[in-house]
């Protein structure tokens, strides 16, 4: 959980790309 929270902010900042955004959403959904 800590790793997800730690990488969450930078990923969201970079996640402007739709592809990355989709991956992040899946990862966050799985993590939470």
From Swiss-Prot:
Propeptide: 1-10, 19-32
Cross-link (2'-cysteinyl-6'-hydroxytryptophan sulfoxide (Trp-Cys)): 12-16
InterPro entries per UniProt: Amanitin/phalloidin (IPR027582)
Domain of life: Eukaryota
Crosslinked positions (Cyclopeptide (Ile-Pro)): 11-18
Record flagged with keyword Nucleotide-binding: no
PTM text: Processed by the macrocyclase-peptidase enzyme POPB to yield a toxic cyclic decapeptide. POPB first removes 10 residues from the N-terminus. Conformational trapping of the remaining peptide forces the enzyme to release this intermediate rather than proceed to macrocyclization. The enzyme rebinds the remaining peptide in a different conformation and catalyzes macrocyclization of the N-terminal 8 residues.
Keyword Lyase listed: no
Any GO MF annotation of the entry: toxin activity
Keywords: Thioether bond, Toxin
Regions crossing the membrane: none
Summary of the function given for this chain in its UniProt record: Toxin belonging to the bicyclic octapeptides amatoxins that acts by binding non-competitively to RNA polymerase II and greatly slowing the elongation of transcripts from target promoters.
Miscellaneous comment as given in the Swiss-Prot or TrEMBL entry: The typical symptoms of amatoxin poisoning are gastro-intestinal distress beginning 6-12 hours after ingestion, a remission phase lasting 12-24 hours, and progressive loss of liver function culminating in death within 3-5 days. One of the few effective treatments is liver transplantation.
UniProt similarity note: Belongs to the MSDIN fungal toxin family.
Name this protein carries in UniProt: Beta-amanitin proprotein
């Amino acid at each position: 959980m800590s790793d997800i929270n730690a990488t969450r902010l930078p990923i969201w900042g970079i996640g402007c790309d739709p592809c990355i955004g989709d991956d992040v959403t899946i990862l966050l959904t799985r993590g939470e």
